[in-house]
Amino acid sequence: MTNPSEGTTPLAFRYTPELANKIEGEWQNYWTDNGTFNAPNPVGDLAPADGKALPEDKLFVQDMFPYPSGAGLHVGHPLGYIATDVFARYNRMLGKNVLHTLGYDAFGLPAEQYAIQTGTHPRTTTMANIENMKRQLGALGLGHDSRRAVATTDPEFYKWTQWIFLQIFNSWFDAEQQKARPISELIPLLESGELKTKDGADYNALGDVEKQKAVDDYRLVYRSNSTVNWCPGLGTVLANEEVTADGRSERGNFPVFRKNLSQWMMRITAYSDRLIDDLELLDWTEKVKSMQRNWIGRSRGAEVDFSAEGETVTVFTTRPDTLFGATYMVLAPEHELVDVLLEKAGSYEGVDARWTNGQASPAEAVAAYRASIAAKSDLERQENKEKTGVFLGVYATNPVNGDQIPVFIADYVLTGYGTGAIMAVPAHDERDYEFATVLGLPIKEVVAGGNIEEAAFTESGEAVNSANDNGLDINGLAKDEAVAKTIEWLEEKELGRGTIQYKLRDWLFARQRYWGEPFPIVYDENGQAHALPDSMLPVELPEVEDYKPVSFDPEDADSEPSPPLAKAREWVEVELDLGDGKKKYTRDTNVMPQWAGSSWYQLRYVDPSNDEQFCNIENERYWTGPRPETHGPNDPGGVDLYVGGVEHAVLHLLYARFWHKVLFDLGHVSSKEPYRRLYNQGYIQAFAYTDSRGVYVPADDVEEKDGKFFYQGEEVNQEYGKMGKSLKNAVAPDDICNNFGADTLRVYEMAMGPLDTSRPWATKDVVGAQRFLQRLWRLVVDENTGEVLTRDEVLTDDDNKQLHRTIAGVRDDYTNLRVNTVVAKLIEYVNYLTKTYPDTIPAGAVLPLIVMVSPVAPHIAEELWKKLGHDDTVTYEPFPTFEEKWLTDDEIELPVQVNGKVRGRITVAADASQEQVIEAALADEKVQEQISGKNLIKQIVVPGRMVNLVVK
């Protein structure tokens, strides 16, 4: 990369990269030494020492915090960080108390894998990575309150992660009140009989162990022997979101198998309705709201009970009106009744060969089929183009018509949605139609309007062939009426019930790793789980010699998890007094998933050094509490602006909302939601290059010749991609800062385009941002002598128009995060001043400019502010205001068309009448040349736009 000043003799006081680096270092030190960006709290150790009241007007702006990777930052990472810094700086100038800081989401698999490879403790690697990232971010001049920075790996942070886990563990969800309540309030309800145990047993007749189990069944955190994604190659289970569409681990690309294991789960499904309904309260993009709605997947319909060999198989359907068209049933291969029904299954004698998958018996067919789908992800199973399944050897009774319908298992039905069983209506469902066609099953029309000989008819229509002799006749009814009448009949006959189902599953909350938050849970000799008291927090990670979970052959689906913490026997086996004397206990050897710390970190930013509470509610109320007078009567509260990538829409953001709602229910926070406003920034893209094998090669080493691209002499293919390590096209911000200056990088990234769109990086274009800053510098500083070039002089009317229009536009753009157009307006104003004042310049024209520039280019603004005689930082200088009178023109210029072609331009008073405009147009010399000797047929004035003359 070449220095733009290279090859010339720089003037002594020119704004060069060297001078920029010097200025930037000095001002960054000044900000640090003076705590320039420190935001005071109402109470606690961050409250004003003099007891001074805080401004009512505040702003809490937050970035999705980074994972401290060993590779450090590339220029794509700071895009959102710079934008939030610009927004925060602007709002400080509006007089707001602004909280803006940045922490580190530092637990996770990369540091652990590096530790496994090198023997280096993950904490050592993580802290080194954090220090490197701090250095890189510090060089950008970000105005963070460094006192509030946190790292999820700090025991003083994860102490409170564990504490929040225990709040959730020690709570239950009251479905009637639709909120979490302490477990202590559950037990009296069970004792009085007001609430039943989950299995219907008499609570008071139970023994101590059974009573504890009855209570545990209600907890928001529970252990479940459920189907999980087991990855032998990583030695851990994965959440659905960590498995790719082709059934492999997102990290490492290992096969993932479905396996039944006992795991910690969080009952996020209890909050499904609130998670959907409260989206309406949030200032989020419709795209993200839609993603969350779809992920939660609320469906209204009915549960219908089918009888099969003495067992009741319950299915969920959104179309109970199509029950008469159900010609077979399908269970998920993992459904709990599959093995029960197999014991009652008949033989395959006389069964259609297409139903048996080439096996001799139902038991053999099921075993073979389960093995064949073990490595498929849920997504892959649902999207599988080829429909497969096997007959269970039993039949179920259709409750509306008594038909005996065959029962199958098939991979397109999942245990994770509905009941794990479906009634198949092939005439009106595409997947059922494909399955029925492949296996030769009957297809019965029950909704009029299509041609089921050709395809399933999935639109609405009148019900047909839908009546029985037992009081149900929906023939001729439209969908909604038919659905309602069918549900009414099912409930009357006790064969079903109207209900709501969700796609959302409970949150798998355990990982078989080392580098994560330990669980504050121990087990007694009977295997009963006990929550540790607050006084025993944090439960710190022990030192271990081997960080590796017991990983297995990636293809070994039968392997069992063995976490690395299980090897630390002195830590695992403990003697504790939990209130009933010292006893022996065993610690839980799993760790929390990487989402735990990020599910609440915004609250620790509010009160980062509080030893007594995770967050004092008075501080929380000030920074994130509802403000109906500002945001409307339904304001849920939360962080004022949260900026990050849309890829976190259904993971981090959903989990954070869940945790926050529990904390709200328990009275620990005043805000209903963690993030009032969400803004998704785009990505910085860059050219990437692949060789003939499709392998990415280092972009820095690619050469261009005659429009083609070569790497080590071999021609390579050029493509655009998201900048990053995997595409080998990363550009380090360190290089740009060193060669151009941090302010230049900031201006360039902000000017590249709208913040919410992706944009291409081009290092060769960075010099344009530097030239703008050099022109700004030259307005104030003589490049030869270093003298200040301002003078006291009244601004002209043109100056005032340019200045006030710039102020008005820039204020609006800063407010709405349109920083690219802020830069455009500032460039336009600098160009005007450069042209108008080639020597010295009125101070009144340039002082407001420096203030307007400072949010986006703070270092040069501070330096110029100082040169113009100010002792204090520009950070808290009031942002310029504008006068309306300068925003309107006294005169306007109008094009004059003759027979539709522009032939001249006239200048008239802004309030000129149509007659005056026509008079001026006819008097214009160029127009007269076009109309001379011709008849004027028509004259049209479009106010403020144009004049059109028609001649013949």
Swiss-Prot record:
GO terms for molecular function: aminoacyl-tRNA deacylase activity; ATP binding; leucine-tRNA ligase activity. It is found in: Cytoplasm. It comes from the Bacteria. It holds the Pfam family tRNA-synt_1g. One of its GO terms (cellular component) is cytosol. Keywords: Aminoacyl-tRNA synthetase, ATP-binding, Cytoplasm, Ligase, Nucleotide-binding, Protein biosynthesis. Its main location: cytoplasm. A motif ('KMSKS' region) lies at residues 722-726. Its EC number is 6.1.1.4. This is Leucine--tRNA ligase. GO terms for biological process: leucyl-tRNA aminoacylation. A motif ('HIGH' region) lies at residues 66-77. PROSITE patterns: AA_TRNA_LIGASE_I (PS00178). Gene3D superfamilies: HUPs, Isoleucyl-tRNA Synthetase, Domain 1. Belongs to the class-I aminoacyl-tRNA synthetase family. It is an enzyme of class 6 (ligase). It catalyses: tRNA(Leu) + L-leucine + ATP = L-leucyl-tRNA(Leu) + AMP + diphosphate. ATP binds at residue 725.
